Curated annotation (Swiss-Prot):
Signal peptide: none annotated. It is found in: Cell membrane. The gene is plsY. This is Glycerol-3-phosphate acyltransferase. Its main location: membrane. The chain crosses the membrane at residues 3-23, 42-61, 68-90, 110-130, 134-154, 162-182. It comes from the Bacteria. It catalyses: an acyl phosphate + sn-glycerol 3-phosphate = a 1-acyl-sn-glycero-3-phosphate + phosphate. It comes from Streptococcus equi subsp. zooepidemicus (strain H70). SMART domains: G3P_acyltransf (SM01207). Probably interacts with PlsX. It is a multi-pass membrane protein.
Amino acid sequence: MKLILLILTAYLLGSIPTGLWIGQYFYNINLREHGSGNTGTTNTFRILGLKAGAATLLIDIFKGTLATLLPVLVGASNVSPIAIGFFAVLGHTFPIFAGFKGGKAVATSAGVLLGFAPLYLLFLAAVFVLTLYLFSMISLASLTASVVAVISVLTFPAAHFLLPGYDWLLTITIVVLAAIIILRHQDNMKRIKQQSENLIPWGLNLSKQQPTNHH
């Protein structure tokens, strides 16, 4: 019973559509009708600005972290925190409070890792920031970090680097989260190929793509 309650709580936590609600209640703007139509951090930044984007990012990360820490907070030592955190990402991606149309799972996945393996998250965040600096594309940075996450979760434990040993639940969760992130970025991948992906005004833009307003 406790397990079911933890899963349900994590899913409902993840389901809070941060960007959508911030847009509706503070800006009277429906994010679904602007930019890419996505309710995640990137579109919130683009449409509503820095304050709203930063708030969305922090809350979406916090959703994942809090869900991951739930078993610890309620003293359920026999329940895997990473497994509970996964249901927050599921909620974020398919939120019951927003017609099951949610974000692209990046921020909340980061939150889950922050609660479970913070040093490992720091490594993936460095990969994300480096890719973002080189290519000026948030989507490409997210995809690169996801692929690196899968490779590293399979290899780092052997060298006891950042991850102390193989944890099959962590490994499965990382692989599934990476798959969700990649699947949620299908449109972005097409635009990257066509050299029409949205750029941010930071970094080297090594692909030499021209800035575009394409959404």
